[in-house]
């Protein structure tokens, strides 16, 4: 089974690569890519095959790159490991020839924005932590960037 993981300098990608490398029941070949030269990021040395990718901000070039790797390596599954890639793949899902599993573009875009996602969940009567407008009376607060994958 040929599995492609991109953005392999990231912690998410490294974790997925490590998990895939432990699978012994199937013959898993991990194909990785990133904008860096091989050896400039740890993930490039942990995959079976490595390709240098164009920046994800060059959308059409990046989609073409994915399709070329799919054709060359006969990719069975692409695992998106970053928010940016998830948004891009959902946006161009009909143009990407590789199999991947993601929600539709509207849903991925909504949940990329933590404030909009929280408001949508509240509107549908789903309990979520409250949003604080005034932090002076709060004892403990978790700060979260609106468009990121982590908290402070």
Q: What are the functions of these language-model segments?
A:
Residues 54, 103-104, 111-114:
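Surface-exposed loop/turn and secondary-structure junction residues enriched for glycine/proline
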Residues 1-102:
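ATP-binding N-terminal substructure of ATP-dependent carboxylate-amine bond-forming enzymes
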Residues 108-152:
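Active-site nucleotide/adenylate-binding loops and adjacent lid/helix of ATP-dependent enzymes
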Residues 34, 104-106, 147:
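Short, well-ordered turn and helix-capping elements at secondary-structure junctions
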